[in-house]
């Protein structure tokens, strides 16, 4: 059996290659050398990912880091922090390019998850409470796209909305992503949210079912394009397994509780970050 996410990932890249349109004119994103980072994009895409078993949703066509994405997940959702130094101490450098003078990323990501919601301590506490006490609700959501605070964020959120639904003791997660860097961001994000889905299911005594992922603008940057096309046409491998150790509560979760077993992958590929 091949890894499920490999096929989904190749379908995404193929869709952009076949139907996408290259950006023109001025673009916000730049490479470290100051060159404009143009991209080929496709608007409006959805995929569904079965997260019901112990398959780790890591691509196998190249090495996909697992530790740094989980540390970022922990920083945003459990620590509910926006302090880049705290993330660095965890061994993750994802946000170094966007660190503001006060050492934070402003009112973004963990700052918004930490906001009190309907009398609950945070958005995550609200989700957990509703799933346990009111599982039939269609209002179990988190949102970190806050219009009147966007100007105070180092970077506006890419993945910004989650919605959680229970049907027959099975937990479904829907994710909404406004902007998707396919070579780098998507690979980390899908793994992160597959783990979050499992953690919330464990906390609430539910079975994880599908993740429904909605992307508005998915794109491949010009300096990524040829390498990514080559990458997704490589041989892929049997999926790794994921194990969550020492689970007591989602609020006691630590990054080292995640164990990845038998991860096989192709030759490593490096991609420049577009800032």
UniProtKB/Swiss-Prot annotation:
DUMP binds at residues 138-139, 178-181, 189, 219-221. SUPFAM superfamilies: Thymidylate synthase/dCMP hydroxymethylase. Belongs to the thymidylate synthase family. Bacterial-type ThyA subfamily. Catalyzes the reductive methylation of 2'-deoxyuridine-5'-monophosphate (dUMP) to 2'-deoxythymidine-5'-monophosphate (dTMP) while utilizing 5,10-methylenetetrahydrofolate (mTHF) as the methyl donor and reductant in the reaction, yielding dihydrofolate (DHF) as a by-product. This enzymatic reaction provides an intracellular de novo source of dTMP, an essential precursor for DNA biosynthesis. Pathway: Pyrimidine metabolism; dTTP biosynthesis. Homodimer. Coiled coil: none annotated. GO terms for cellular component: cytosol. It is found in: Cytoplasm. CDD domains: TS_Pyrimidine_HMase (cd00351). It catalyses: dUMP + (6R)-5,10-methylene-5,6,7,8-tetrahydrofolate = 7,8-dihydrofolate + dTMP. InterPro entries: Thymidate_synth/dCMP_Mease, Thymidate_synth/dCMP_Mease_dom, Thymidate_synth/dCMP_Mease_sf, Thymidylate_synthase, Thymidylate_synthase_AS. The keyword Cytoplasm applies. Its EC number is 2.1.1.45. Keywords: Cytoplasm, Methyltransferase, Nucleotide biosynthesis, Transferase. GO terms for molecular function: thymidylate synthase activity. This is Thymidylate synthase. Signal peptide: none annotated. It comes from Fusobacterium nucleatum subsp. nucleatum (strain ATCC 25586 / DSM 15643 / BCRC 10681 / CIP 101130 / JCM 8532 / KCTC 2640 / LMG 13131 / VPI 4355). (6R)-5,10-methylene-5,6,7,8-tetrahydrofolate binds at residues 181, 274. It holds the Pfam family Thymidylat_synt. It is an enzyme of class 2 (transferase). The active site is at 158 (nucleophile). GO terms for biological process: dTMP biosynthetic process; dTTP biosynthetic process; methylation.
